[in-house]
Amino acid sequence: MSSYIIAGKADDPSFARAEYAAKQVLALYPNIFMRFEMKHPDEWRDFINSICRKYDFAHYPADFSGPLVWTLEGSLIGGSADFVQAVCLEKFGIKDLPSVSDPSFKHMAADNLKQVKLDHHR
């Protein structure tokens, strides 16, 4: 079973696109595992630095804006575009995904940020 972790800032349309693409994969392949690590923008830098140290993704700079995708086993996939290309398109055949500039991803990112803020206050 393939397992992926997709991490990103809640307000990032690129993360929203990766999340959307992953859900398209899950709709066709329910045995795939996808975990979403949606972080408040203020938490992102500390989070991504700890992930890069933990998995030895040393070539990512401290100010990497994300998103970042890796396997549960710790193999780096890359950023959102790498995930869409290598996993969604090439491995699972998901085609016709909207580009990151599609307005729906800005709306998803705004909704994600609202959710993270709500979760933060609980």
Give each language-model segment a name.
Residues 70-104:
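Non-catalytic, surface beta->alpha helical segment in thiol-disulfide oxidoreductase systems
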Residues 1-45:
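Local sequence-structure signature of Cys/Sec-based thiol-disulfide redox active-site neighborhoods
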Residues 29-33, 58-66, 94-96, 102-104:
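Glycine-rich loops and low-complexity Gly/Arg-rich segments
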Residues 10-13, 61, 75:
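Short amphipathic alpha-helical molecular recognition features
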Residues 46-47, 82:
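Exposed alpha-helical structural elements
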Residues 52-70, 78-82:
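Structural micro-motif
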Residues 17-28, 48-58, 86-90:
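Short, aromatic/basic amphipathic alpha-helical patches
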Residues 1-4, 96-122:
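N-terminal leader/targeting and pre-domain segments
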